[in-house]
Structures are given as C-alpha cells and as structure tokens.
Amino acid sequence: DRQCCSGLDALLLGQALISAGQADVVIAGGVESYSRRPYRAHRNPDGSQTTYDQASFTPWPNRDPNMAKAANDLAHYSGIDRQQQDSWAIDSHAKALASRMHLASEICQIDIGLPQHDAYSRPLSARLCTRAKAIYGSVTHANTAVAADAAAFCVLTAASPATKRAVQLLGGISIGGDPCLPGLAPIAAIEQVLDRYQLNTAKLTHIEIMEAFAVQALASIQGAGLDPDLVNRHGGALARGHPIAASGAILAVRLFHDLRSTGGIGLAAIAAAGGLGTAVLLRTE
C-alpha cells in the first residue's frame, strides 16, 4: 500500500515496464474517490466491530502516529512555527487563484454540472488562519490539505513523440524512512535522485512538492536546499485538496505542462504514511 506515493510510483512502474521491453506505451497515474471511501472496522473475537479511520502503516503501534501528530512533530524537529505554516498556506491559495486560467489546459472538463476548475482555493488571510481550529499543535485546518476526489494520468511512450519540447521521465527514487517523521522521507529521495542523475538543486527549473501539510513542503525545501520561489508556483494541495492516490500523478501533470511551456528540468516529490517517500525527475529533450 503506497498511499500518497502511489501516483508517482505508478509512473516509475510504467517506466520500468517500457525499459524492460514489456510495453511500448503505458498509461499511469492514480484515482481517488475519498467521498466514497468505505466504512472500515476491525472484527473482534467476540464478533463486535471497532471502527477506524487510519489504517496501520507499521507493525509497531508506538511508531505509527496520526498524520497530524507526525506533521506537528516534524514542525518541532525542523524548527518551523505556525506562522510559517500559515504563511505558506496563504501563498498557496493566492498562487492557485492567480493561476486558474494558466492551469485550465490541465483539467479535463466533465460535464456533470461541476466547476471546470479547482473550486477550493480562496483568498486566505492571516486573520482566518489565526481563527482556524488546531488539529494537533501548530497543525491547523488552515495549513492542512483537505481530502478530495480526483484523477490524474500520464502517457509514457518508448519513443519520443515528434513534438516540440517532448518531456522525458528521467527516473525516480522510492525510499523508506522514519515512520514517526514521514515528512522527512522526500528529502532523502530528492538527494538520492539528484545524485543518481548527477544533478544539483541549482539545475532545477520547476519543483512540485506535495503539501498535504504546509510543514511538509517547508521541511522539504529546508532539508533539501530547494529554492522556495521554484516550488509549487501555481499553488499546491493546500489550495486544491489531497486526493491521496492521485496526488503524486497531479504533481507530474503539473511539471509536464510547465516543462512543455518553458523547458528545463523538473522535480516532483511526495511523502506517505509509514515513512515512504518518492522523488521523480523530468526534463525537456
């Protein structure tokens, strides 16, 4: 169960199939219908049931924290306060609102009476953030991404398409880290994937970091030495929601469109419960 990493991991599995000669074209991505999530319960020996919302992600109960608690622990570990988290959330919403027209080409329009854009982003203010209810410590409803429904897919091909600025999936890294601080996992994944392809952060032109929590993005920027001005330039999950299985693929779709437009080298990275992390590099040929 790759949880939040699954959308990016699907791309790497598709790339592996093509590299092994098992396929010429692969459609890879993810779908999440959080609004239709099943009712989950453990059946006890006496026949009774105990409901639960978060599944177990490690065999050690004392190393399997609630994700909000893990985010708050990450904030303490990284020295990131609530004001910094709120500021990142405010910027995410502002960038998403400013980019609605820019992102229109990324969204497949489904005529079922719903908005043809990400409808959640809004003018978020410091005052609203201050009033937001705390979930755990410095982690609040304002600096945490809401659960969402979405789907995102990429088409991977063995041969480069005969188009201007074809985008190449260089490759990626999936790693395991401390399950108590899963937000640190993308840092190691970023460092390893850059090392594998003999690149450094100065070579990156576009960066998409999953922001299930504001502190997650801030910790990745801080830990991996990323330029914050390059990260989530059109807003992120804080402004649009976190459709778990689709979130990683959404990062890749964003990079694809930006790289097709301007060229360069793009990085996408995401963390998942259990201490998982995946980082992927794309570039224009």
Predicted segments with their positions:
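Flexible glycine-/small-residue-enriched beta->alpha junction loops
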Residues: 19, 25-73
